[in-house]
Amino acid sequence: MLSDIDICRTTPLKPIEQIAAKAGLLADEFETHGLYKAKVSARCVKRLAEQQDGKLVLVTAITPTPLGEGKTVTTIGLAQGLQSLNQSVMACIRQPSMGPVFGVKGGAAGGGYSQVAPMDELNLHLTGDIHAVTAAHNLAAAAIDARIYHEQRAGYQAFEARTGLPALRIDPDRVVWKRVMDHNDRALRKVRVGINDEGKTINGFEREEGFDISAASELMAILALSKNLQDMRERIGKVVLAYNLDSEPVSAEQLQVAGAMTVTLKEAIKPTLMQTLEGVPTLIHAGPFANIAHGNSSIIADEIALKLSSYVVTEAGFGSDMGLEKACNIKSSTSHKAPDCVVIVATLRGLKANSGLYDLKPGMPLPDALFQPDRAALESGFSNLKWHIDNAQKYGLPVVVAINQFPQDSAEELGQLKLWIQQLPLNVRVAISEGFAKGGKGMEAVAREVIEACDAPANFRPLYRAEQTLEEKIITVCTKGYGCGEVQFSDTAKQQLALYQTLGFGELAVCMAKTPLSISSDSSLKGAPSGFTIMVREVRLCAGAGFVYALTGNVMTMPGLPDIPAFMALDIDENGDIVGLS
């Protein structure tokens, strides 16, 4: 079989104007960026305001191996499968970060015959939205250090007299806004800025600083959760950048940088239109990770697609404990649109990995034994799939299991897994997913199950209520959402939660940052663990995004590169074509 990039390169694509017309966009509702990309204006939502929304299908997964289980393949393949059944459909996915592209997982365009195309343009820069987020974020970081420098250099009263601005009196030790970049770079997790030659202060005042990856920026979450440009402007103004010497929050509005940050993101708020290999219109917008952010594409993209098509297929990052939880408790509470159906992607290799019998290391190839028949390992790991089915049903949503088939998979084991699912007393639909090898035709069975599931009654319910305290919400997600026995809070986390409650942020949602490789916060606990303890070590405030961000275990907001990173395989040939991208 051809490589992903060769399949993409040898498949004829339609001009983006044809894809826009197919989606139902008018000529003044999109702007082309080259032959195969366009920026889409949300004005079409106003034009179609009276039109009934389509059905929203959310694709999630079992607890994945480090390489993933084919969620994007399933998302794109399912959209093509629905089209193959003559349904009006669009897909909505996140923009890939270059961190994973050059790091462990590689690209995020899907794979095989279920891809968004051109996949190299999607995976590398696209229309520059992530760079815009990075620039807007770092503008605020520069503004903070500049304000500290000018106020402290002159003295607060002299600064006020000279500028006519109020002194913000920022505490240099309580700046909470780190810088960001769209790469994995562990060396930048902790740095010092403002370093000067002896006796000089020209470079600012020295303080400890650090970098996060751009996907973890609060601005990325704001981009994904904003309903329009004005909403984004208001949210950016609420971002807390630091605290002053009286322990009061200093916002982007107070620093008078919120307007410029919004200007930098003016074009980024427009989703990018592309196409699948079979011509399904696909909106790409925002790129928050699900382990260190809220892990879902944008509300704006969903709203546009739901007005233009009968079915919208989107995905939530990692397993249902991660992206699905955040889709239901953060995204849906903001958009007031719940999924009509949940698709859980399961694989033989992923379930065997959840038996705990294999030693999997991020950045290393999966062991060959995972691809060999092993009924005992499959049966042991099946508990993980049952957990994820139960988890989706906690939210009152119909469930379809898509068994993503790999070429090495045993037909006997595929049949056995399907039988086990059919025997569950949980009213779950199931089908084999062959989108990678066969495109839309290989997804028709899953698509039929999804159509039926979307017509089934749903009774959506989030896990917690806004009026609960932040601590109560975190405990609810950990106990009801993950099944842990005890939640512990570090002294730092306790102090932070008390501060946020006092400052009036108690009604915000909670966004858990934890490993995606276990339902727990310990990546070594496989299957369906219960009774474990989760330690919340730090809680960060994202007032503009509308949540607090609880860090557990050893999760990092700036990833590092593995010993054999994906960038080693990338190059460019004499024709200017990229090679080695997957």
Curated annotation (Swiss-Prot):
Gene3D superfamilies: Domain 2, N(10)-formyltetrahydrofolate synthetase, Formyltetrahydrofolate synthetase, domain 3, P-loop containing nucleotide triphosphate hydrolases. One of its GO terms (molecular function) is ATP binding. Pfam families: FTHFS (PF01268). CDD domains: FTHFS (cd00477). Keywords: ATP-binding, Ligase, Nucleotide-binding, One-carbon metabolism. It catalyses: (6S)-5,6,7,8-tetrahydrofolate + formate + ATP = (6R)-10-formyltetrahydrofolate + ADP + phosphate. One of its GO terms (biological process) is tetrahydrofolate interconversion. InterPro entries: Formate_THF_ligase (IPR000559), Formate_THF_ligase_CS (IPR020628), P-loop_NTPase (IPR027417). It is an enzyme of class 6 (ligase). ATP binds at residues 65-72. Its EC number is 6.3.4.3. Pathway: One-carbon metabolism; tetrahydrofolate interconversion. Belongs to the formate--tetrahydrofolate ligase family. This is Formate--tetrahydrofolate ligase. The lineage of its organism: Bacteria, Pseudomonadati, Pseudomonadota, Gammaproteobacteria, Vibrionales. The gene is fhs.
